[in-house]
Amino acid sequence: MVIDVNWREKYREKARKVLDKPSKYGVDVDIKEYMPQEIREEPSLAEYRDLLESVGIEVEEKNRSGSYYQIESQVISAISKQPGLEILSIEEAIDRHGNELKDYYWRTVHVDQDKYTAIAELRGSGGYYIRVKKGYKISFPIQACLLMEMNRSLQAPHNIIIAEENSEASIITGCAAMKEMVGLHAGITEIYVGENARVNYIMIHKWNRAMHIRPRTGVLVGRNGVYVSHYIAFTEMKSYQSMPRVILNEGARAYLSSTIVLDGDSRADSGYELILKEKRSSGQIISRSLTKGNSEIVTRAIISGEAPEVKGHIDCQGLLLSDKSRILTIPILDAKYDDVMLTHEAAVGKLSEEKILWLIARGFRRDEAEGLLIKGFMKTEIPGLPEGLEKMIRYTSEKIAKSII
């Protein structure tokens, strides 16, 4: 097979034209201040065990089917432990698969969307390629870890996940700053769920108060496929903006949830866009936002019913834990046929003093009562998750609830 080595050039041309194009939402960032950096020496991951475990990464990998590690722009390892599962760096995948990868590159995310997609194509490095072959059910989760430690650095990997027909996999992506530093993370993730396939995608972020976070994610779900996504962020950060776009074909289903806890002067603009493209597709967008200090978050949720017999629901809840923080929720429902069912509910408020006093009257200290209420607020029922993933999410949520009070 003849490999066209120049097929990426058209994307680079588009990217060069939008290097000054701001995002539609969120705080604008001067991308010229950040450059990719190589690490001076490879650190021992065991030294960062607590940090890695807090974002869902298992250092020993006993209950993992494969793993990918990247620090700054440097790929540390990409390993598959199970037949039917391929894990490579994106550069290795391009070299190995050549023209085949063109069908999955900048398809669900457009390279000229904004300056962050552009910089990922022009200056980005690394990223994982995960492919689950037709008919394979991957027993344990796959984990991907993206870490940053260098000051004024840019980390902009391009990740591609392909779950072929009748396959199933769970992916845990943990992203974190290894120390206090100024940086920009602008990862691109494209996910393709084949016919009758299922992908569970869990992303956990823990950054710091000087980081700008700009993930760009696009998902395409084939006929009768299932995509489940849960995003967790518990951190201070300078700013965050992300709006994953999920497209469902006939009979496909999606469950998109997020739990975001902000503190300090953090600014976030977060949400999902769900497009019910073909008949009998359905999905939910569930968000839980908690703010402390002077933090602010805008939570967006858009569902477009673009075919008959589709169903969608939005549930946005916000909890203000300080008088100076702010939560703004913006649900949008767009029905283009008369036989669709699109609904939403939204609420923003503070902890109920009545409920706190009720728990105190039953023997709980005030901090314990508040912790129980916060834990209950953060709980989301995610359908069909493997038991191991459920336990990990529950454990992470409990740790977050304890750290808030």
Which stretches of residues belong to each language-model region?
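Long, low-complexity, mixed-charge
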Residues: M1-H110, Y116-I119
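Conserved beta-strand/loop scaffold segments within soluble protein domains that form the structured core
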Residues: D4-V5, H97, Y105-F364, T380, ...
